[in-house]
Swiss-Prot record:
Residues 17-75 form the CpcD-like domain. Part of 2 PBS rod complexes, the conventional CpcG-PBS rod and a photosystem I-specific CpcL-PBS rod, both of which include ferredoxin--NADP reductase (petH). CpcG-PBS has on average 3 stacked phycocyanin hexamers (PC, CpcA and CpcB). Linker CpcG connects the PC stack to the thylakoid, the hexamers are linked by 1 copy of CpcC1, 1 copy of CpcC2 and the stack is terminated by a single copy of CpcD. The CpcL-PBS has on average 5 stacked phycocyanin hexamers (PC, CpcA and CpcB). It is found in: Cellular thylakoid membrane. It comes from Synechocystis sp. (strain ATCC 27184 / PCC 6803 / Kazusa). This is Phycobilisome 8.9 kDa linker polypeptide, phycocyanin-associated, rod. GO terms for cellular component: phycobilisome; plasma membrane-derived thylakoid membrane. It is a peripheral membrane protein. The keyword Mitochondrion does not apply. It comes from the Bacteria. The gene is cpcD. Its main location: membrane.
Length: 83
C-alpha cells in the first residue's frame, strides 16, 4: 500500500515470536476470578509469560486483579522458568 514500509511485515513477524515475562506482585482473589481452576497467591511474586501481541491486554488484566507489575523482561527459552 501507498505510504507503508516494506519492513512492516518483517517487523510484525519478528514481534509475533517475542515473549516477555512479567513479574507481578499483589494479585488478589476476586469474584471475577474465583471460579478459575487455581487460586491466586496473595503474597510473593508470580511470573507470567506474555506474547508481545498480548502485552497491553495482560497489563490491563493484572491491573483489574489488583496486581503490580514489578519487572518485565524478555523470555529466554533455555532459562529455568517455573511456569
Amino acid at each position: 500500500m501507498l505510504g507503508q514500509s516494506s519492513l512492516v511485515g518483517y517487523s510484525n513477524t519478528q514481534a509475533a515470536n517475542r515473549v516477555f515475562v512479567y513479574e507481578v506482585s499483589g494479585l488478589r482473589q476476586t469474584d471475577a476470578n474465583e471460579n478459575s481452576a487455581h487460586d491466586i497467591r496473595r503474597s510473593g511474586s508470580v511470573f507470567i509469560k506474555v506474547p508481545y501481541a498480548r502485552m497491553n491486554d495482560e497489563m490491563r488484566r493484572i491491573s483489574r486483579l489488583g496486581g503490580t507489575i514489578v519487572n518485565i523482561r524478555p523470555y529466554q527459552a533455555d532459562s529455568n522458568e517455573q511456569n
